[in-house]
A protein has these predicted regions:
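Compositionally biased, intrinsically disordered low-complexity segments enriched in Pro/Arg/Gln/His
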Residues: 11-12
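N-terminal catalytic or cofactor-binding beta/alpha core of small enzyme domains
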Residues: 27-199, 204-325
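Intrinsic disorder/low-complexity segments
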Residues: 1-2
């Protein structure tokens, strides 16, 4: 087989032939990879010693695109990349040296989305019958953003034609389920060590000014499922720190937290989950898919943020005690 680099160049050429005028090949090469397989599909990186009960997750920053997926798509790579939380994994990478485990996906969100239920599937996009247990009626499915997405960006259809149910189930078995098994193990490992754990699920959002005249968004959005996925001190600590950095912060609007926040957060057992949505204008050029000059500043502020969370007294995070105690 040809090297990954030559294979990727061949795919770019093929895709540009199919979509003349595409800017598929006009992005810096180090920003995205095209491979025939994921090696590895995701990473869980742990420090030599944890300095607190806090870990970070970046499920939507993957930018390794399977060649067969690109050829099956009717969209160019730049359009597909609009669904990426670009460089969020790089923003949190330095936290490992500060004593915090991180997890990051390498596969793209538009290929399989781990921030969904395992079988949120849209019957309109598949050839064949879906399993009876598939959730075909969720709001996310209705919007084309199920476990295997039908659309990206402004409701742009990803595929030229229907894909097989078997292909969707393959992605779920090979990527979705192993990702969650690994994330759960990492979360529970921290919980066993400290008696509690805080999972910060990191995402990014368009600034609202990249493609059209939209109202500017907050700098950061804290999502705690309206106070159900973590104890109040977690969200309060995040908000206080972020406002101290000078950022405009909102809570649960417009993002209250997705499947990961809801599924992993269980404060009654000492498991706390919170979603952190970062405005892309804070750290990148959204049109060119490049880091901006403020990237390092934000990465440093996230290190301070992690330290503040780690300073929360464990007694405030551990499982609720009976009133008699």
């Amino acid at each position: 087989m040809a090297s990954r680099a030559s294979y990727g160049q061949w795919l770019l050429a093929r895709a540009k032939e199919r979509r003349p005028g595409s800017d598929l090949g006009n992005r810096p090469a180090f920003m995205v990879e095209i491979q025939d397989e994921f090696d590895p599909p995701f990473e869980a990186v742990e420090p030599a010693a944890c300095c607190g009960a806090v870990l970070f997750n970046s499920p939507h920053s993957g930018r390794v695109y399977p060649g067969a997926f690109l050829l099956a798509s009717r969209l160019d790579l730049a359009t597909l990349r609009r669904s990426e939380d670009s460089f969020v994994d790089d923003l949190i990478a330095g936290l490992v040296e500060r004593g915090h485990p991180i997890m990051r996906a390498h596969f793209p969100r538009c290929y399989v989305d781990v921030n969904r239920e395992p079988y949120e599937l849209d019957p309109r996009m598949f050839e064949g019958r879906l399993p009876s247990f598939a959730n075909t009626r969720s709001m996310r499915v209705a919007g084309g953003l199920g476990t295997v997405a039908r659309v990206v960006g402004d409701a742009q259809e990803i595929y030229d034609q229907r894909i097989s149910v078997a292909e969707a189930l393959r992605r779920i078995e090979l990527l979705y389920k192993p990702y969650h098994r690994t994330l759960r193990r990492l979360f529970m490992r921290v919980h066993r060590e400290f008696g509690a754990a805080i999972l910060v699920d990191c995402h990014s959002m368009p600034s609202g000014t990249a493609g059209r005249d939209e109202r500017p968004r907050a700098d950061l959005v804290i999502g705690d499922r309206y106070g159900t996925s973590c104890v109040p001190v977690v969200s309060e600590t995040l908000e206080t720190a972020l406002r101290g950095f000078g950022y405009a912060v909102s809570r649960n609007k417009p993002y209250a937290g997705g499947f990961i926040t809801e599924h992993y957060g269980n404060p009654a057992t000492g498991l706390h989950a919170v979603q952190l949505e970062i405005n892309r204008a804070l750290y990148m050029d959204e049109r060119r898919y490049e880091r901006s000059a403020s990237f390092d500043r934000l990465a440093g502020e996230l290190e301070i943020l992690a330290a503040r969370l780690a300073e929360i007294p464990l007694e405030e995070l551990r499982p609720y005690r009976a009133a008699a105690e």
